[in-house]
Amino acid sequence: MKSNEIKGDNRYTSMESLVRGIFMELITSKVLDVCSGIGRLMLENGAETYRVEDTVYRVAVNYGMQGVSVFSVPTALIITVQDQTGQEYTRLHRVTELKSNLGIVSEANTLSRKIAAHELSPNDALNEIDILNRKEPTYSPVEEILAAGLICAFFTILFLGSFADLIAAGILGAVGYAVFLYSLKVINIRFFSELIASFAIAWLAVFLRFLGIGDDINIIILSSVMTLVPGKAITNGIRDLMASHFISGVSVLADALLTAGAIGVGVATVFSII
């Protein structure tokens, strides 16, 4: 009789352990979904890798995970956590689409602060992440093109250009950015899109100068390509290097160097032709 009771207790204990293990695995999987979702949002939209790692780490810890380890580069995110039983789980997420939307980065940071304040469960956080993933771009292509023209126009003031240079740079900045967006959509290779856009800007600058529009062609071209200059990439690369994230820092700076090279080649090609 006692033997049967012991066997029954053992079965009950093993069943309880199995249920607890399945429950912990489900919870940990949800937490990893939240961590990888927030990290991917930040990486895709231009956040620095050290900021991504810090945010993902804090999210995992605030959800009760132990032994949290996060590693990110501009195109990948690796997260390892331990549940309360010591079981390790790892999630690898590949980032293929890189763009610049600091508004999404800010909203992802706000989401992580809500998690730190214990305002969101993993399911609620996943719903918020899904909303951010489906969010439409803040500005339309037409608005971006007009903004690019204004930015380039006012750069002529910084470079001590004339009012005629301001008008020419505004026109070329808008046209050049439109060429960049169109070629990026067709070719889907950023390097060639920037090369084509800078070539178009330099060629049109020569044409406008031939028509008597603008005074200093150097200031016009320099101002018109400013929206193509990888300022954010250079800043992020230097900040990653300063934070000892050497792999991501060097890769981001290499991308910025390629972009600068594409702009230079596009402009130099026009001057070599004329």
Residue ranges and their predicted role:
Residues 210-274:
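Generic detector of multi-pass transmembrane helix bundles and their immediately adjacent loops
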Residues 116-125, 139-145:
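Short, flexible active-site-proximal loops enriched in glycine and acidic residues
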Residues 88-100, 138-139, 143-145, 252, ...:
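Alpha-helical transmembrane segments and immediately membrane-proximal extracytoplasmic
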Residues 9-120:
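Soluble N-terminal domains of membrane-associated systems
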Residues 137-211:
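Core alpha-helical transmembrane segments of integral membrane proteins
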Residues 3-4:
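Intrinsic disorder
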Residues 128-137, 247:
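Cytosolic juxtamembrane amphipathic/interface segments immediately preceding
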